[in-house]
Amino acid sequence: LYTLGYNASKKLINLNLAVKENLKTYLSQYRLMTDAVNIKDAYIINIGMKVNFIARSGFNKDEVSLKIIERAKQFFNIDRWQINQPIIIQELAYELSIVEGVGAIVPPTQDNPNNLSILITNKFSSADGYSGNIYDINYATKDGIVYPSLDPSIFELKFPNTDIEARAIGDSIGNQL
């Protein structure tokens, strides 16, 4: 059984030994005589995201950018995610494309070898508060889906206010920024 918990700030953490022992004791009443209960920590893969967009004419690009960030926060709300759930880029792109003021989602050109509409990056620096787990997002991305590790793991947008970058690159009447 692979587990994780979260702290008061809803950031993923490994469960302490007391919680694991309580869980093991509770589950033992439902196991068969020959079964064993092994509780292990799942891996946390911290991510960031970059999205470029074209704003509709008449909309403030900064306000649209903030709305995109809010929608991305909702998409990556940890209560909506499970261990080993992949990130389907097209679902995220659709969610962001229906934000008021967004004309189009445009693939970032820098550091985007798969030319995806939204760039997902690995944030791993322990010194910056991340899990320390390094994960090759580009290698794990196939056909617009970011797959988790073969080891039980979960994607987490740990610091959404800094880990989400939304950049207006133009507007719907052809002005480039």
Describe each PLM feature range.
Residues L1-L177:
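Acidic, low-complexity glycine/serine/threonine-rich segments
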